[in-house]
UniProtKB/Swiss-Prot annotation:
GO molecular function, one term: protein serine/threonine kinase activity
Natural source organism: Mus musculus
Residue ranges, annotated region (Required for interaction with TAB2): 1-304, 434-527
Keywords: ATP-binding, Cytoplasm, Kinase, Magnesium, Metal-binding, Nucleotide-binding, Nucleus, Phosphoprotein, Serine/threonine-protein kinase, Transcription, Transcription regulation, Transferase, Wnt signaling pathway
Catalytic residues in the record: D264
Full protein name: Serine/threonine-protein kinase NLK
GO process annotations (BP): cellular response to osmotic stress; intracellular signal transduction; negative regulation of TORC1 signaling; negative regulation of Wnt signaling pathway; peptidyl-threonine phosphorylation; positive regulation of receptor signaling pathway via STAT; protein phosphorylation; protein stabilization
Protein's gene: Nlk
Modified residues (Phosphoserine): S522
Disulphide-bonded residues: none
Amino acid sequence: MSLCGTRANAKMMAAYNGGTSAAAAGHHHHHHHHLPHLPPPHLHHHHHPQHHLHPGSAAAVHPVQQHTSSAAAAAAAAAAAAAMLNPGQQQPYFPSPAPGQAPGPAAAAPAQVQAAAAATVKAHHHQHSHHPQQQLDIEPDRPIGYGAFGVVWSVTDPRDGKRVALKKMPNVFQNLVSCKRVFRELKMLCFFKHDNVLSALDILQPPHIDYFEEIYVVTELMQSDLHKIIVSPQPLSSDHVKVFLYQILRGLKYLHSAGILHRDIKPGNLLVNSNCVLKICDFGLARVEELDESRHMTQEVVTQYYRAPEILMGSRHYSNAIDIWSVGCIFAELLGRRILFQAQSPIQQLDLITDLLGTPSLEAMRTACEGAKAHILRGPHKQPSLPVLYTLSSQATHEAVHLLCRMLVFDPSKRISAKDALAHPYLDEGRLRYHTCMCKCCFSTSTGRVYTSDFEPVTNPKFDDTFEKNLSSVRQVKEIIHQFILEQQKGNRVPLCINPQSAAFKSFISSTVAQPSEMPPSPLVWE
C-alpha cells in the first residue's frame, strides 16, 4: 500500500485557501517516491468456494441483433429475466444447503464450464447472448467481511470483469424495526456521492415479492481496512497517518453535512484500497441527527472502545460530536498502534477517559444521567494528563497532539467539528498528497495538475428520513423496498441477478451474520 510522493505545492495551497481552481506547477510526477507498501493481510479460509455475480437483459448488452427485431429481443430478454426469478419454478428463492451440511468446494469440472457455472452473480442472459470473455479466468468468490448486519463477499461483475463487493442484507423482513433500519441503510447507500464514503454501485434484481427475503448490494471492492493495517507489522509513516485522517474527516464532513450520524466509527469500518484511498462504510447503525433535544435516542451504538463519554454516561440525546470522539480515538491508535482506551467494561471505559482528561466539570456532564454523575463525583478528583499523548510515538508532534486534544474533549459542545478539524495545519500535507495523486476530483494535464474548486465538498440537500414516519407494516415496507430497488436499476446497465447454481453462492446464503459478541455491547444501565 503505497502513497505517491509529492512536493508541497504552493499553487494547491493557494487553491485551498482561496477556494479557486488552479493548475499545478508544471513538473510531471513520473518518479513517485513510494512509501512502504502495506499489503492487505490475507484471509485464511479453509475452502475458497467457486466464483459468484450473472449481466440482466441481454437486449441491453447487444442492441444490434441481426436475427431478431429489437422488440422481440427485449421480449426474449424479459422472458429470460422472468424465468430466472419465476416463483413457479423455484419454490424457495435460492436453494440452501441441507441443514448442518457445510458447503464444500464445487465438484471438479473443466475450468471454463466450472467458472461460468460457478459465477455467483450473472446477467440475465437469453440464448442469443454470449458470455463475456473474462469469465474464463476468474478469481474465486470468497467472504471478505462480516459487518454488524450482513455478510460481504468479493465477486466478479460479469458485465465488465471487475471485482466488486457484494453485501447480503439477510432477514430483512423479520419485523418492522429491522425493515426500517435496512431501508434506511439502503437509501443512504444510494444517496451517498462522495469518494470517502462507500456507496451502492448496484442492487441485484429482486425476485417476485413473494420470494423477496434478502437484499444484495454491490459496492466497490476495497482490499483492506484500518483495523487490519493498524494491527499489521508494517510501519505506518506520518504521511500515511495524515492522509488516512484527512480522508476520514473529509468523508465525515460530508456525512455530517447530510445531517447523518454514523454512530459506529471504528477502524474496521474504514475501508482502504491498495492506493490508500479510504472509505467510511457500514451504515447499519447510522441515523439522521435528532435536533429535538426532548426526543430520546438509542444508546446501543458505537463499539465500546470508540464510544464518546456522553453515551457512556447515559445521555439520552447526543450529536454528531460522537463521531468526532471516535475519530480522535482512531487518530491516537494510528499514532500509537494500540487502542487508546481499552477497557473491560463501560464503567472502566469512562474511568480510562477521565484518567487522561481529568475529572469533568458539572457543566461538561450536564446531559449525563444522575447515576453516571454520582459515579464520577464519588471517585477521586483527577488532574488531566494530556501530555502523555506525546509518548504515543515519535509521530506525535506538537501539531498532531494539538489536533488530537481538540477531538478528545469531554464536553461534546466544545469538541471540534469535522469541518474545523480539516482546517487544522496538521492536515495540510494529507490534503496535498490526497489531491495531488489519489483523488478523482482533480486531474492532471500536460501542463500540470488542475485542482477542484472544492477540496472537501458537502451535500445539498440533506438526507431526508421523513419516509420513515409513514412506515407501518412489514408488508408495506417490503413493497416499498421492492419498488425502490426496481427504480434504482441504473439506466441502460444490464441488471444483475444471483446465479443460484453457484457453489460459492450456496456457501454465501448459508453464511451467518455477526455473532452477538461482535455487536456493539448493550448500554450500561446506571443505577
